[in-house]
Amino acid sequence: MEQVVRIHASSGTTGKPTVVGYTQNDIDTWANIVARSLRAAGGTAKDKIHVAYGYGLFTGGLGAHYGAERAGCTVIPMSGGQTEKQVQQIMDFKPEIIMVTPSYSLVIAEEFERLNIKPEEISLKVGIFGAEPWGEGMRSEIERKLGIDAIDIYGLTEVMGPGVACECIETKDGPVIWEDHFYPEII
C-alpha cells in the first residue's frame, strides 16, 4: 500500500464493491487518457466542462475532473444531484461540455423543460456519457432534448475508471479502446 495514493471502489450494484488502489502513475495515466477522450469528443482547452458525475469513491467525478484539467479545460465540479442547481450553474457558467450519466442528463433536460428553457438557449454542445448502459434511442432523446452531440465513454473501476475507451465525435459509432494503454481479451 505504500505506493497507493488513492482508493476508489465500484458501485457494488451486484454485490460488495470492488476496492482498487491507484498509484500516482495510475492517476497520471488516467488523467491523460480522459484528456485524450475529451479531445476525441471534440473538447478543446478553451472549453468549460460541467462535471455532474458523483465525486467520491466512484471513479466518474474525479476521473472527469482531472482529465479535463489535464486537457486545459475549465472545470465546474458540480457532482451529482441538486438538479435545480445543475441547471442554474449551466445557465450561469455556460459550459460547452457536460460529463454525466445518460439517465441523469435526461433528468437535467426535464428541469430545463420545466423552466421553459429551450435547447437552443443552452450553452452545451457536447455531452460525454458513461457509468451505465445506454443505447441509440436514449442518445437520440438526449441529443434532441439538450441540443447536443452525445458521446459514449467507457471505463471501470477495476481498470482505470472512465477513459478506457471513448467515441469520436465525427462518427459516434461506438467507443474505441485506447490500445496503447489497454489490451482487451475476449474470453
Walk through the language-model features, giving the residues of each.
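Short, structured coil segments at secondary-structure junctions
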Residues: A71-G72, F93, S123, K145-D149
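AMP-binding/adenylate-forming
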Residues: T23-S37, K48-V107
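Glycine-rich helix-loop-beta junction characteristic of Rossmann-like nucleotide cofactor-binding loops
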Residues: L38-G43, G67, K118-E120
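Conserved S/T- and glycine-rich ATP-binding loop of Class I adenylate-forming
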Residues: S10-T13, I49, I98, G127, ...
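Adenylate-forming
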Residues: Y104-S123, S140-K145
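Conserved helix-loop-beta element of the AMP-binding
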Residues: K48, L115-W134
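Conserved AMP-binding/adenylate-forming
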Residues: W134-I187
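Nucleotide 5′-phosphate-binding alpha/beta core
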Residues: M1-A9, T14-N32, R36-A40, T44-K46
